[in-house]
């Protein structure tokens, strides 16, 4: 009985000591934003969805290639933000990390131009889809500075600029790899939330 109790207490102390502030991006990290947005765009513009997906265009390339994109942008993102699907096992892994005493701090570049009210849109979606979080920051251009201010221990994002921004301030950075985003050098890489969980405590 004493051995079991000692093991439990020791394990508890380890978990408490390992508490971290985990910074997490939303689009294409928690959600399948790219795929969902292309589905909406293909319907709006009458384009071949499979062909559009296979081209692996970046967001900037998509914007430049579509007529009147600026006129439709807010509507496109508004529909996407409400209907976007989640990455596999993201809810389970984030809940597990939070249950282990870590703080989940969501940091997104979602802005007022594309989303109207990015905080409201994001908050309602996250709560409605049972995504656990302790803080939510929107319209963040310089994620490196914010991560430093919030004492982030480890950060995950798909975007090249964001990963470089955070990595450059000395914070452990993980890129969530996608087919349409170049890989960042000098950071860790995962392609699933299960992989990220395995990486967190290494």
Per-segment meaning from a language model:
Residues 27, 157-158:
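Acidic di-acidic motifs
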Residues 1-19:
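Short, Lys/Arg-enriched N-terminal segments with co-localized hydrophobic residues
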Residues 103-105, 154, 172-174:
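A structural signal for isolated positions on well-ordered beta-strands in alpha/beta enzyme cores
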Residues 17-69:
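Active-site neighborhood of HAD-like aspartate-dependent phosphohydrolases
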Residues 81, 90-122:
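Substrate-recognition element of Asp-dependent hydrolases with the DxDx(T/V) motif
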Residues 110-154, 160-164:
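Substrate-recognition "cap/lid" segment bordering the active-site pocket of phosphatases
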Residues 148-149, 160-202:
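Asp-based, Mg2+/Mn2+-dependent phosphohydrolase catalytic module
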């Amino acid at each position: 009985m004493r051995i079991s109790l000692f093991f439990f207490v020791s394990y508890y102390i380890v978990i408490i000591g390992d508490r971290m502030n985990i910074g997490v991006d939303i689009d294409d990290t928690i959600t399948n934003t790219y795929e969902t947005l292309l589905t909406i765009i293909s319907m709006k513009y009458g384009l071949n969805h499979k062909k559009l997906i296979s081209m692996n265009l970046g967001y900037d390339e998509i914007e430049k290639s579509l007529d009147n994109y600026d006129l439709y942008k807010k509507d496109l993102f508004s529909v996407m933000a409400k209907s976007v699907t989640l990455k596999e096992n993201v809810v389970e892994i984030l809940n597990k990390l939070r249950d282990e005493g870590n703080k989940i701090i969501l940091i997104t570049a979602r802005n007022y131009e594309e989303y109207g009210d990015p905080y409201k849109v994001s908050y309602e979606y996250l709560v409605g889809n049972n995504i656990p979080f302790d803080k939510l920051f929107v319209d963040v251009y310089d994620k490196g500075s914010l991560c430093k201010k919030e004492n982030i221990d480890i950060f995950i994002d798909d975007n090249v600029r964001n990963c470089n921004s955070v990595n450059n301030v000395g914070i452990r950075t993980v890129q969530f790899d996608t087919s349409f985003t170049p890989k960042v050098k000098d950071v860790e890489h995962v392609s699933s939330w299960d992989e990220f969980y395995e990486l967190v405590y290494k």
